[in-house]
Amino acid sequence: MIPETYLNVYIGFLRYAAPVLVILLLLRCFKPLLTFRKEPEIWAWLMLQDGSKIPVTHWENTVGRHRKCDIRLDFPTVSRNHGVLTRYDDGSWTVSDTDSSGGVLVNGEKVNICALHPDDVIDIGGIEMMLVPISRHQEERLAELRSKGTGLGYNLANVFLLTVFQFLCAVGYLLSAGGEHVQSVMLGFGGIMVCQWLLLLFYVCIRRTSYEVETIAFFLCTMGMCAISAVVPSDSTKQLVAMVLGIILFLMLGWCLRDLERAKKVRYLAGIAGIGFLIITLLFGQEYYGAKNWLVIGPMSLQPSELSKVCFVFVGASAMDRLLRNRNLIVFIVYSVMICGCLALMNDFGTALIFFVAFLVIAYMRSGSVGTVGLAITALGFAGVVALKIAPHALQRFNSWRHIWEMPLDAGYQQTRSLMCMASGGLLGLGAGKGYMRSIFAADSDVVVATICEEWGLVIMVLMVLSVVALSFFAVRSAAVGRSSFYVIGACTAASVLLVQVILNALGTVDVVPLTGVTFPFVSNGGSSMIGAWGLLAFVKAADTRQNASFAVRILKKGRGQDA
């Protein structure tokens, strides 16, 4: 048994050491993600008949009269969005028509989509041109000039800092527990340490050395393990298994997204799986606290809607040649209505809101129309009024919103206690295992930010939120140089889903928005939530175009006609 004096000394040391370590770690992770250069890349030239040439700066390029087109042809015979010019991994090119009025011709023949060969003459709205791709040598030069990802040494230092922080956390909870739950705490924190080092080793083997995105995710997983160790230490093994499954899903999606054509094919399976998960839950799920969103299989219980988020992002992402066709947008709208309809029948309005935000992001990125988004928001307003009329569970949440101190022993019990515990934690927290949130319902999930804030302080809680904000900014910055709209839409939508979850969880805890029961990605206790968060992270990682950074960008082998 550790004397109380020694325990207090260690906890006091940890209260000051932890914020310093976390600030240093996250600054090192944030800097390369938010400051990398966005160099324009030229992959080919369009040679016009008058001798002028237009640079082709993306792998997918819209061609038309609209000012937002990548390749703008300001002629009255050219449609606003006339066609798409696409490059593939093997260096080949295609041109496709996007339901334009004049059509696209190649060597005088009208085409819907056509592979391009040297000396082919492309006719767009009567404007003839030839595509001249860059040479292999120029492509190698482009790869050399691309922003370099951080090196192995840099990321080794980051993971070492994180490991030190994890070790200090584990010791703090072991000492506070007084010999209880030793195995659970050691397995939980030790398992995260092993996983993060093994994943880094795997990256080294495949020559990918940038590891900031994953380091941020492992930091958030560590804070989640802290909350579990404080509230329900026996759940640490379950959460560790979920994290391992999430990492496997992350790598599987990475392999799938590495080949854009393969990703397009898997998208249809993802669509079937996404709606299938919800239908199965609707038929066989069990209702807890007003929402029928749990599927119980023997000793296991899961929320399939968390996995449906990943499928929804996969379905929403689309290549440019299909992006501009109204038929595809209509199909996606119908699919979205089916998803939200299932969630409404399940009374899972928090998750439905997240799906709707994802839909807004995808709809805007697909159409570029603010009017489309405005119409969708108006529809949400009407749907929300109807939902509050027919669902007493949702109405109760809104009745207590902004009135929790008027009913502190009833509907406001959870949030009022959370606010008091957060206030008692202050900037640096009470210390590992010294909080009182363990007696509050869902202290490790719905109101997990209060548990972290009480024991680790407001500083670390805010850094948790900023971690997800940084991932979102990184996704937006990567979009400017994205190789394909598939990656751009996927990354921005996934980052938006993660960010909205954080907003609903954190602000719901402090009664700024209604408490929806939405989880904090990577932090909240819940296997389905953990797996889904890692799945969404794969889309953010895939959008990274820095040199040797992402598993979605192949490494160019010099002097050879193929990529690694």
Language-model segments: which ranges?
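Forkhead-associated
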Residues: 55-127
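Hydrophobic alpha-helical segments of polytopic membrane proteins
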Residues: 326-345, 349-389
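Hydrophobic, glycine- and aromatic-enriched re-entrant/interface helices and adjoining loop segments
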Residues: 288, 292-294, 301, 374-464, ...
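Intrinsically disordered, low-complexity acidic Ser/Thr-rich regulatory segments
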Residues: 1-75, 89, 137-146
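Hydrophobic alpha-helical transmembrane segments
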Residues: 19, 190-195, 244-246, 454-475
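C-terminal boundary/linker segments immediately following FHA domains
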Residues: 4, 105-151
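Hydrophobic transmembrane alpha-helices and their immediate junctions
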Residues: 459-502
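Membrane-helix boundary/helix-loop-helix interface segments in multi-pass membrane proteins
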Residues: 158-191, 196-346, 496, 506-521, ...
